[in-house]
C-alpha cells in the first residue's frame, strides 16, 4: 500500500491513516478494494474511470486494480482520459464524453439487469 508516496497521497494520511503504521495499515488493507479482490467472487462488471493527469488520485490505482481484475478473470471496463485532472475531464467536450460513457454504462446495466 503506497498511496501516501504518490502525488497528493501523503495529505490523505490525516483522514485515512498511515499505511506504514501496523494498526492503521492493517485496517487500510481490510477496506482496500484492491487488496480485497477475490478470484472466487462473482463481481458485477466494474467501470474504472481515471485520468492520466489526475494530480490527486494517481491513475496507477485504477490501472493496477483493473489489472488484478483481469488477472483473476473478472469482467470490467476501463477508460483513461489523457487530459483532464481529478474529474477526468479537461473541457466541456471531454466532460460530455465521460458523462455519456457513464450514462451508457448505467443504462446498459439497468436494462440488462446485470
Where are these regions (language model features)?
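Active-site-proximal cap/loop segments of hydrolase catalytic domains
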Residues: 1-114
Amino acid at each position: 500500500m503506497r498511496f501516501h508516496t504518490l502525488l497528493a497521497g501523503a495529505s490523505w494520511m490525516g483522514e485515512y491513516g498511515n499505511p506504514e503504521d501496523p494498526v492503521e495499515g492493517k485496517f487500510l488493507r481490510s477496506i482496500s478494494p484492491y487488496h480485497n479482490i477475490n478470484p472466487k467472487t462473482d463481481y458485477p462488471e466494474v467501470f474504472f474511470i481515471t485520468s492520466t493527469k489526475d494530480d490527486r488520485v494517481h491513475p496507477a490505482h485504477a490501472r493496477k486494480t483493473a489489472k488484478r481484475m483481469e488477472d483473476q478473470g473478472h469482467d470490467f471496463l476501463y477508460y483513461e482520459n489523457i487530459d483532464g485532472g481529478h474529474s477526468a475531464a479537461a473541457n466541456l467536450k471531454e466532460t460530455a464524453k465521460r458523462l455519456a460513457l457513464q450514462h451508457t454504462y448505467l443504462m446498459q446495466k439497468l436494462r440488462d439487469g446485470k
